[in-house]
């Protein structure tokens, strides 16, 4: 029997849906999901998605860079690192009023979550009053709030929680095995420690990674395994497709096979069935057909607007047109809660 004939005999119902509650996702288990026939993988991911979410609703988030450039970290993918010559000019923290103006515009454009990102290793104490004021102001507009500011101390996480921050983003970026090839100034454990502080403060965790940085499929599976085995797994999982920026160490990295990106979305959905899975940076590299496949694979959120920190993003009008063609509607944050 040929390999194709063997694959054809596999029934989708025989494919494991998810690990039992008591079982951790081993890397080998996640690799096995990646290696399923493409149609079977998407079929199973869509089944899992429909068990927990409205399959035709996508939550829209807008991301604003509130402090751009000059970061002390040496992340090999990032244009904002002071270690790389990308021509990006470092800027100071934005004024609160300017941030709130941007939030109003995002809400008028259909976003239900407003994310604020600062290029820091960690925020300083002098920044905290402005940051907490931003959180309170954005919440008063009726938007969900999210911040990504680097590593946090316990007290800082508590301050943000007291201000009403809904989500804190701190990505693992990649697998532990590949991590050292991308970053040297922050350890993997540093990232895990910040996630613990955020969770202990009562803030929802937003945590994902970047694929297409030259890692192997097994290393992609290692990232998903790490995320799925967090206790609990993240409420929100952004999946970024590398944007190879000139002047960064990864500028010459070969593009990832787009079907591998779709596979990653599907595997994230299966292993983290109640998480919101978000299409993030690099979405402009996907044509409409591939984005539709991502929604079929279980993506149910995306960053919306013309710029994602310092990388471009598909125009809002184009996104609306795609939603109309697919019969997808935007959903507010409350409606995106997973079904029991």
Curated annotation (Swiss-Prot):
UniProt keyword Glycosyltransferase, yes or no: no
EC code(s) of this entry: 2.8.1.6
UniProt binding sites for [2Fe-2S] cluster: 115, 146, 206, 278
Binding residues for [4Fe-4S] cluster: 71, 75, 78
Enzyme class: transferase
Domain Radical SAM core: 56-283
Keyword 4Fe-4S carried by entry: yes
Protein name as catalogued: Biotin synthase
Gene: bioB
